[in-house]
């Protein structure tokens, strides 16, 4: 039996403990080929994750480091990066993963592995972004960016600038986020850009356009991103689809949401709770039902609150729905108690009072709050007097004529 057949036999073994022993045996046998050992390392890592022993991965990688001295640096780089990608699939281990990547960065510095260090640092700052450690991530990224620009490593430069754009967006610095993304897209156009990286760029472009309320352009970017992710069978395809549906809701095109979900694109996600959540939000928005909107956000809180992009736009959507409902309730009154409005809309009095104050300050509603009596006094909208405007225009025209006559008189004299 050759080495590849042995690997396949171990992979088909139902006894996990025996499989682990056999993989370790291959790693310790001097005669086993290097490529077989490389495959055994990654298979063993995946097995640990599969059986819920992901915490064993750091120990495993440390134990095989002597083997890395016997193979080329590019092969080592590939194994370590794949190993970290496997470790990334372990649930709820972000803090451990960050420390593990830091440990490997230090190992790269000690062994003078510059190429691998730069890529692991990029991975580290991406993980720090996910952990919401924005300040440290941005600080380290700026230093790395300067180093990579000197080397003119365009593929890595694109990845770094994309991460920078995400961090700046998280910090609500949209101009800098857009500048970083523009640089990433410009550099990506000068090289072969892997499909997944291009999909990430399109996704970030859509997010920034949606922040600027350009939902039509955002939708087109999300659609491009979805098609690429879908062709790669990447789970991020569902995320892109969610953002596509959100764009349709924000532009009041709720009929298109139904068409997308029940069409070719949405069929494979028919029973997905995240897509179901967005669909229900669309229905509540179409009905202008604040109560239904609240029920949906409560029922699907895990699917809607975990994503900051979705959460941000749903907050805006809720605010718009609340304004529309308040305007509809207040419309018949010239003076009404705030407590009565709160009772009709089924919200706490302080929430309603705060929202009415903002609407009045933003000049979305013409009235005042009498806090002494706890009432809203509504002013009638003053109709524009067309005769007054016409009179002003006539007087202005006469003034210009008189000025011209005065100038001519001065010339004659």
UniProtKB/Swiss-Prot annotation:
**Which keywords does this chain's UniProt record carry?**
Proteasome
Keyword Transferase among record annotations? no
Identify the InterPro entries for this entry: 26S_Proteasome/COP9_Components, PCI_dom, Rpn6_C_helix, Rpn6_N, TPR-like_helical_dom_sf, WH_DNA-bd_sf
User: What job does this protein perform?
Assistant: Component of the lid subcomplex of the 26S proteasome, a multiprotein complex involved in the ATP-dependent degradation of ubiquitinated proteins. In the complex, psmD11 is required for proteasome assembly.
Q: Does the keyword Zinc apply?
A: no
Q: Which family does it belong to?
A: Belongs to the proteasome subunit S9 family.
Q: What is this protein called?
A: 26S proteasome non-ATPase regulatory subunit 11
Gene Ontology cellular component list: proteasome regulatory particle; proteasome regulatory particle, lid subcomplex
Q: How does it assemble?
A: Component of the lid subcomplex of the 19S proteasome regulatory particle complex (also named PA700 complex). The 26S proteasome consists of a 20S proteasome core and two 19S regulatory subunits.
Q: Domain PCI spans what residues?
A: 217-383
An annotated Gene Ontology molecular function:
structural molecule activity
A biological-process GO annotation: ubiquitin-dependent protein catabolic process
């Amino acid at each position: 039996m050759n080495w590849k057949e042995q690997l396949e036999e171990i992979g088909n073994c139902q006894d996990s403990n025996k499989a682990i022993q056999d993989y370790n045996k291959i790693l310790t046998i001097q005669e086993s080929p290097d490529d077989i050992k490389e495959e055994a390392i990654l298979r063993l890592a995946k097995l640990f994750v599969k059986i819920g022993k992901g915490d064993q991965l750091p120990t495993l990688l440390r134990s095989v480091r002597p083997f890395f001295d016997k193979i080329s640096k590019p092969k080592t780089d590939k194994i370590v990066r794949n190993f970290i990608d496997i470790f990334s699939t372990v649930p709820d281990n972000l803090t451990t993963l960050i420390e593990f990547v830091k440990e490997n960065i230090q190992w790269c510095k000690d062994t003078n592995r510059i190429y691998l260090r730069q890529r692991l640092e990029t991975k580290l700052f991406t993980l720090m972004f996910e952990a919401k450690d924005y300040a440290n991530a941005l600080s380290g990224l700026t230093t790395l960016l300067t180093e990579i620009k000197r080397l003119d490593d365009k593929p890595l430069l694109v990845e770094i600038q994309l991460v920078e754009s995400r961090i700046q967006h998280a910090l609500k610095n949209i101009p800098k986020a857009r500048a970083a993304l523009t640089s990433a897209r410009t550099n990506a156009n000068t090289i072969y850009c892997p499909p997944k990286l291009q999909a990430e760029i399109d996704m970030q472009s859509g997010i920034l356009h949606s922040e600027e309320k350009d939902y039509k352009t955002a939708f087109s970017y999300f659609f491009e991103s979805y098609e690429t992710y879908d062709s790669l069978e990447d789970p991020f395809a569902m995320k892109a689809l969610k953002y596509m549906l959100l764009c349709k809701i924000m532009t009041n095109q709720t009929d298109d949401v139904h068409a997308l979900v029940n069409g070719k694109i949405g069929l494979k996600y028919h029973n997905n709770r995240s897509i179901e959540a967005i669909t229900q939000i669309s229905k509540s928005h179409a009905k202008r039902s604040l109560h239904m909107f609240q029920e949906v956000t409560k029922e699907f809180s895990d699917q809607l609150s975990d994503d900051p992009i979705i959460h941000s736009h749903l907050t805006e959507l809720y605010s718009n729905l609340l304004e529309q409902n308040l305007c509809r309730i207040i419309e018949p009154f010239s003076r009404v108690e705030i407590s009565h409005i709160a009772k009709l809309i089924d919200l706490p009095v302080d929430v309603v009072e705060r929202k009415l104050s903002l609407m009045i300050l933003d000049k979305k509603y013409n009235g005042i709050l009498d806090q002494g009596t706890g009432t809203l006094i509504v002013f009638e909208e003053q109709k524009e007097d067309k005769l007054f405007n016409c009179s002003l225009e006539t007087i202005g025209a006469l003034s210009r004529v008189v000025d011209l006559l005065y100038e001519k008189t001065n010339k004659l004299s």
